[in-house]
Curated annotation (Swiss-Prot):
UniProt key word Transcription: no
This protein's name: Thymidylate kinase
Keywords: ATP-binding, Kinase, Nucleotide biosynthesis, Nucleotide-binding, Transferase
Organism ancestry: Bacteria, Bacillati, Cyanobacteriota, Cyanophyceae, Oscillatoriophycideae
InterPro entries noted in UniProt: P-loop_NTPase, Thymidylate_kin-like_dom, Thymidylate_kin_CS, Thymidylate_kinase
Organism in which the protein naturally occurs: Trichodesmium erythraeum (strain IMS101)
An annotated Gene Ontology molecular function: dTMP kinase activity
Amino acid sequence: MIGKFIVFEGVEGGGKTTQIELLQDWLLETGESRQILPKSIDLDLEVVITREPGGTKLGKALRELLLSPDVLAEKIQETSELLLYAADRAQHIEALIKPCLERGTIVLCDRFIDSTIAYQGYGRGLDVELIKQLNYIATGGLKSDLTFWLDIDVEIGLARAKSRGNFDRMEQANIEFHRRVQQGYQELAKNNSLIVRIDANLTREKVQQQIQAIIMQKLVEWKYI
């Protein structure tokens, strides 16, 4: 595939949505001024933002089930939750991500397979190896070209999330759950060189500067410039 798949990960309140939007704007501006297109692609630069769950029509329905506290009158069991995320991902890959990458698009995705390992594996306590196998089935082995882990103090992140308004079902989990999720991201980053830690405790401008510096290096490595 000739496009690039860039994922943003992290606990609640890390600013993923803001940073993705800022990066999209910067990439498009940089593309216009520096002609950052591989020589094999004779197209205008396209940068698409998506998210998990919720990147497709099916995904939006699953997102409502997974994250809205009042949709279901019963508790979603941990294994059911895991399988719903996998269903969202399988649809997302085939309906949106693969077609975008095949036509040379840069895809910026808010959460991917590492979220499932961190939240359902470390957070919920489900078998991490089983989750990895399920992720492989859902993705067909597709991995990100680069993952940014927006690392923020858990308490600060939850306070930021709370300031936005109503908590979703994940944000309502207790602090110990979120600390376990953070531990999951720490372990993932230790063992995967494609995961780049970004200090998300800083201002959004400084966070974006860190991201752009890494992306500029990658654009050279990927022969975009």
